[in-house]
């Protein structure tokens, strides 16, 4: 089991903000659920549908990548998607968070911006459900609390499990595959 409390903390400096280690671990967990964490470049250069048998990567990507999100609709067996990067940002989402938090319409798709904007998006998703950052810090040892966190993040990251009122888990978006909650927690 991977569990968000067990992951290595691979995030670097984020826009001069101090990110609690539990939040860094949660961002690593998101990357793991999206299937990008163990890839070359730690997933920052991955396009939706990447496997070891194909080369769906952002051409010429590096940590200081000077271009924005490509916002190209890539064919993926289950659906077309614009998802890219470590956190599989959709093109429209990237532009929205770029404008909101960086005051740019399509910020550079580099490592620092991907980490920072994923952190901001995570906080936004959680706050919409009344979940504070402190609540996250308290969930490492409380599985029931983490269900609330998982359900809040599932609409943003389809690979995150959504647990319904009957305890059944699924992807928030019916046709996609979500990771098993026991593996995520």
Question: What does each model-found stretch correspond to?
Answer:
Residues 2-107, 116-185:
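Cell-wall polysaccharide-cleaving catalytic domain and substrate-binding groove, primarily
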